[in-house]
UniProtKB/Swiss-Prot annotation:
Bias kind Low complexity: ranges: 393-433
Protein's UniProt name: Activity-dependent neuroprotector homeobox protein
Record's disease association: Helsmoortel-van der Aa syndrome: A disorder characterized by intellectual disability, autism spectrum disorder, and dysmorphic facial features including prominent forehead, high hairline, downslanting palpebral fissures, notched eyelids, broad nasal bridge, thin upper lip, and smooth philtrum.
GO BP, one annotated term: positive regulation of neuron projection development
Gene name per UniProt: ADNP
Residues where Phosphoserine is found: 98, 409, 413, 608, 709, 736, 738, 805, 876, 878, 886, 889, 921, 953, 955, 1071
Record-annotated DNA-binding residue ranges: 754-814
Species of the source: Homo sapiens
One cellular component (GO) term of this entry: nucleus
PANTHER family for this protein: ACTIVITY-DEPENDENT NEUROPROTECTOR HOMEOBOX PROTEIN (PTHR15740:SF1), NEUROPROTECTIVE PEPTIDE-CONTAINING PROTEIN (PTHR15740)
Location of N6-acetyllysine modifications: 1035, 1042
Length: 1102
């Protein structure tokens, strides 16, 4: 634990297993060599047999399994798990060993490679990484006395927290993100960039001079694949990683961020040395004092690197520049002693690598900035500037270092300076007598000219570059870039931090927008040409704190210098339509930010690129920072709608970190700035606001629409009807100052069929069973229902969707396999009295006749009619035999048949029966004369269609014949009781339904005093006919397409009539078996009963 950090841990861990094996072999050889020497001390067999491990010690090695050595750095102490990455180890510990997660998990030290649990790591940091306290108080009384003496002074603790970035792979750390990123490029990605690097000493750089370019030794290298010539080795490595390998996310993942306790810095004193101190040395003594009192606590080697970048150019010339003029302490170490500067006088000053950051901002030590000869404050007005019209610039030595410069004589006129500086000169008197400008942006930002290598204040630099180098000023807008500080910006599309040197290339990927017409360009040259042609007379708006400037030199044709001014997103001057603005300022009543500025900016529409164009009208492709999906449409609307619908968050600003982040739309909880999409998923599982009504913000934004809709469906219909008025209102509200209340469509709440609350902690099978219950209630869930179920049950959406899909497929397979039938428990007679929209077939449409004859067995009648239509010449003989048998049995009535003697075999479908019903009085007279012989005829006629249909089921079905048959005799074309006439009247037969009347009067015979056997036979016949009717419903073409030569002759029935009762019972048993009806086609009864007009079937539609 208390050892110094060991390097090359990977190599040591790989060799450790081999070392253990070698040591074990050496020990085994030693034991074999000395076994003879210790034999005299060996006990006898009695003690060996009666001694166990428990007699020696409590630990039995035979009960434990020898665990293999784990070469990965993060090893779990409770199980054999090990991982190379700390994130995987942490996830394993959280999921498997969550009972004591905080105290048992290994944590990595942010300063070195030491890993330990929480308590041990705290001790480790206190011993090895504790800051040096400056002067701790001896006792509490002295501390109180000190506070009493310094009561008027501001309280300062001995130490403060400093935010630093650190490399997760080594001990390197730095307060600047860019420095740590460059370190990773140089130290940890050499193997990635090595195949792409090529030496090109004979090739020179292109004419473009990038920002801060230096004459370094790496300038002779270039990329093999695309011939990219970088300004440094780190730039080439970044180019390879970003453009060719596309593994930039790995670099981002290797950079960590933490807060370090460092001692509070003392005021920095940069006293000019005496003239006799001029001598050549590697490091001036002043830098040593700077390292001890700097704001950041850095290792000595890193501080030297920061203050002397680049290393090769820190020579005697650079040191001499530190001590050429007597200077006193100022914010930048610059203050005059004499009356003024002569024209030829030169003044040199040594600054840190990034002077505005490394030098502390002590406003009490700042008195004047670049004063004139009479000691007057350097005002921004032209009157104060007149006595010292000097341009102060710091020129770097050898055109290489940003940290050293020379103060030169000026050539800038008074009018040129007042043009740029006059923006802040409205109150010159207040500027002269007011507080010192130590905290203003103009005193904190210096820029170096990339062409003449001179250092300027930022407000003077833009005018210098435009006038001296004939630079063309090109304005642009990139509202997706948030400027963090001078060296780092954040892309709101990609949710990535970008350094200054790669920011322009990244913005060109998304596109820069014209501030006047909102055209998007991915090339600076095309944008500059667009400005020259279209907006040549337009005036530039005032420069804000969020403006980024880039100096470029184009090589097309002649050298063209371009000063690109990009207006980025800033919360302070964001328009009212900004989503992040509303997230940061979210009182119940929407505020009106900057009303005066907006009114002035709306009059000259093209003068201000930031305020004139509303933020929400940026039209283009938007990239979601959470799921990286491409969104099309207005940037603000599309991104806000996507975040709300897909991720259920809205943009806001973190109240502590002051960074752009998101908050939950259900519970209004704010996520941290380094959250991901998986963080939202985990939160939604346990969010208490999910499923409740929308939050108060949505109710205030759209109170009328939410009150109008009591249920889900009216909301959608109401919104569709109000779509065009709402669009019109949006357009009117965009022009006004107040923010629009109709900015977002309110999200309709999801109503679940079953409440999944309480099932998230159940087992996997229990949650699946809940989904099955939900499927029985709602088999077709919507997308949002699936998302809500996934969030509530802690399941993947794909699992839930596949579960519902499998259930639906199983239902379909079961329906096809088991052929389920739906029993309609309707009283059809009563149903016909009611007006309804149900459409029944002609078979089930009954007329309201008397109670006794309301139910007519239509299928039995159809069977008789089918038996009557025979094709062969023997059919007439069969009818004669039937008449003879009926006469012998004593039947008093004779059925009359008119049969066409010759029927064509080609068209058996044309053989259609024509029914001529008799009067009701005649049928009643015949009912009284019925005897036993007629019942046998009834039994035989009942049996006959069953056999015929059993034979007809073997034939193939012809769909065309069915259609033609239905067209010939459609039941819907005739009224109730009308005569059905087919299209082929030539092949028809006519008969009088005397026998049918006999069949329809079986109910009276059942009530009469007949034998029990006859009653039983009649009841079984009715059940048989009903079963045949249900099984043969829907198709009749199998019967009608049967060749008439295959139909059975009536002579075959003569023998059956001799013993009708036995054969009828056998046929009844066969029909009850049901197997023969499974092969029968459906739909026989519909067309067949439709042709029977005299059986009290109604063809009217209900």
């Amino acid at each position: 634990m208390f050892q110094l950090p060991v390097n090359n841990l990977g190599s040591l861990r790989k060799a450790r297993k081999t070392v253990k094996k070698i040591l074990s072999d050496i020990g085994l050889e030693y034991c074999k060599e000395h076994i003879e020497d210790f034999k005299q001390f060996e006990p006898n067999d009695f003690y060996l047999k009666n001694t166990t491990w428990e007699d020696v010690g409590l630990w039995d090695p035979s009960l434990t399994k020898n665990q293999d050595y784990r070469t990965k750095p993060f090893c779990c102490s409770a199980c054999p798990f090990s991982s190379k990455f700390f994130s995987a180890y942490k996830s394993h510990f959280r999921n498997v060993h969550s009972e004591d997660f905080e105290n048992r998990i290994l944590l990595n030290c942010p300063y070195c490679t030491f890993n330990a649990d929480k308590k041990t790591l705290e001790t480790h940091i206190k011993i090895f990484h504790a800051p040096n306290a400056s002067a701790p108080s001896s006792s509490l009384s002295t501390f109180k006395d000190k506070n009493k003496n310094d009561g008027l002074k501001p309280k300062q603790a001995d130490s403060v927290e400093q935010a630093v970035y650190y490399c997760k792979k080594c001990t390197y750390r730095d307060p600047l993100y860019e420095i740590v990123r460059k370190h990773i490029y140089r130290e940890h990605f050499q193997h990635v960039a090595a195949p792409y690097i090529a030496k090109a000493g004979e090739k020179s750089l292109n004419g473009a001079v990038p920002l801060g370019s230096n004459a370094r030794e790496e300038s002779s290298i270039h990329c093999k694949r695309c011939l990219f010539m970088p300004k440094s080795y780190e730039a080439l490595v970044q180019h390879v990683i970003e453009d060719h390998e596309r593994i930039g996310y790995q670099v981002t993942a290797m950079i960590g961020h933490t807060n370090v306790v460092v001692p509070r810095s003392k005021p920095l004193m940069l006293i000019a040395p005496k003239p006799q101190d001029k001598k050549s040395m590697g490091l001036p003594p002043r830098i040593g004092s700077l390292a001890s009192g700097n704001v950041r606590s850095l290792p000595s080697q890193q501080m030297v690197n920061r203050l002397s970048i680049p290393k090769p150019n820190l020579n005697s010339t650079g040191v001499n520049m530190m001590s050429s003029v007597h200077l006193q302490q100022n914010n930048y170490g610059v203050k005059s002693v004499g009356q003024g500067y002569s024209v030829g006088q030169s003044m040199r000053l040594g600054l840190g690598g990034n002077a505005p950051v490394s030098i502390p901002q002590q406003s009490q030590s700042v008195k004047q900035l670049l004063p004139s000869g009479n000691g007057r404050s350097y005002g921004l007005g032209s009157e104060q500037r007149s006595q010292a019209p000097a341009r102060y610039s710091l020129q770097s030595a050898n055109a290489s270092s940003l940290s050293s410069g020379q103060l030169k004589s000026p050539s800038l006129s008074q009018s040129q300076a007042s043009r740029v500086l006059g923006q802040s000169s409205s109150k010159p008197a207040a500027a002269a007598t007011g507080p010192p400008p130590g905290n203003t942006s103009s005193t904190q930002k210096w820029k170096i000219c990339t062409i003449c290598n001179e250092l300027f204040p930022e407000n003077v630099y833009s005018v210098h570059f435009e006038k001296e180098h004939k630079a063309e000023k090109v304005p642009a807008v990139a509202n997706y870039i948030m400027k963090i500080h001078n060296f780092t910006s954040k892309c709101l599309y990609c949710n990535r931090y970008l350094p200054t040197d790669t920011l322009l290339n990244h913005m060109l990927i998304h596109g820069l927008s014209c501030p006047y017409c909102r055209s998007t360009f991915n090339d600076v040259e095309k944008m500059a040409a667009h400005m020259r042609m279209v907006h040549i007379d337009e005036e530039m708006g005032p420069k804000t704190d969020s403006t980024l400037s880039f100096d470029l030199t184009l090589q097309q044709g002649s050298h063209t210098n371009i000063h690109l001014l990009v207006t980025t997103y800033n919360l302070r001057d964001a328009p009212a339509e900004s989503v992040a603005y509303h997230a940061q300022n979210n009182p119940p009543v929407p505020p009106k930010p900057q009303p005066k500025v907006q009114e002035k900016a709306d009059i000259p529409v093209k003068s201000s690129p930031q305020a004139a164009v509303p933020y929400k009208k940026d039209v283009g492709k938007t990239l979601c920072p959470l799921c990286f999906s491409i969104l099309k449409g207005p940037i603000s609307d599309a991104l806000a709608h996507h975040l709300r619908e897909r991720h259920q968050v809205i943009q806001t600003v973190h109240p502590v970190e002051k960074k752009l982040t998101y908050k939950c739309i259900h519970c209004l909880g704010v996520y941290t700035s380094n959250m991901t999409a998986s963080t939202i998923t985990l939160h939604l599982v346990h969010c208490r606001g999910v499923g409740k009504t929308q939050n108060g913000q949505d109710k205030t934004n759209a109170p009328s629409r939410l009150n109008q809709s009591p249920s889900l469906a009216p909301v959608k219909r109401t919104y569709e009807q109000m779509e065009f008025p709402l669009l019109k209102k949006r357009k009117l509200d965009d022009d006004s100052d107040s923010p629009s209340f109709f900015e977002e469509k309110p999200e309709e709440p999801v109503v679940l069929a079953l409440d999944p609350k309480g099932h998230e902690d159940d087992s996997y099978e229990a949650r699946k069973s809940f989904l099955t219950k939900y499927f029985n209630k709602q088999p077709y869930p919507t997308r949002r229902e699936i998302e809500k179920l996934a969030a509530s049950l802690w399941l993947w959406k794909s699992d839930i969707a596949s579960h519902f899909s499998n259930k639906r497929k199983k239902c379909v397979r079961d329906c096809e396999k088991y052929k389920p039938g739906v029993l309609l428990g309707f009283n059809m007679k009563e149903l016909n009295k009611v007006k309804h929209e149900m459409d029944f077939d002609a078979e089930w449409l009954f007329e309201n006749h008397d109670e006794k004859d309301s139910r007519v067995n239509a299928s039995k009648t159809a069977d008789k009619k089918l038996n009557l239509g025979k094709e062969d010449d023997s059919s007439s003989d069969s009818f004669e035999n039937l008449e003879e048998e009926s006469n012998e049995s004593g039947s008093p009535f004779d059925p009359v048949f008119e049969v066409e003697p010759k029927i064509s075999n080609d068209n058996p479908e044309e053989h259609v029966l024509k029914v001529i019903p008799e009067d009701a009085s005649e049928s009643e007279e015949k009912l009284d004369q019925k005897e036993d012989g007629s019942k046998y005829e009834t039994i035989h006629l009942t049996e006959e269609p069953t056999k015929l249909m059993h034979n007809a089921s073997d034939s193939e079905v012809d769909q065309d014949d069915v259609v033609e048959w239905k067209d010939g005799a459609s039941p819907s074309e005739s009224g109730p009781g009308s005569q059905q006439v087919s299209d082929f009247e030539d092949n028809t037969c006519e008969m009088k339904p005397g026998t049918w009347s006999d069949e329809s009067s079986q109910s009276e015979d059942a009530r009469s005093s007949k034998p029990a056997a006859k009653k039983k036979a009649t009841m079984q016949g009715d059940r048989e006919q009903l079963k045949w009717k249900n099984s043969s419903y829907g198709k009749v073409e199998g019967f009608w397409s049967k060749d008439q030569s295959q139909w059975k002759n009536a002579s075959e029935n003569d023998e059956r009539l001799s013993n009708p009762q036995i054969e009828w019972q056998n046929s009844t048993i066969d029909s009850e078996d049901g197997e023969q009806f499974d092969n029968m086609t459906d739909g026989v009864a519909e067309p067949m009963h439709g042709s029977l007009a005299g059986v009290k079937l109604s063809s009217q539609q209900a």
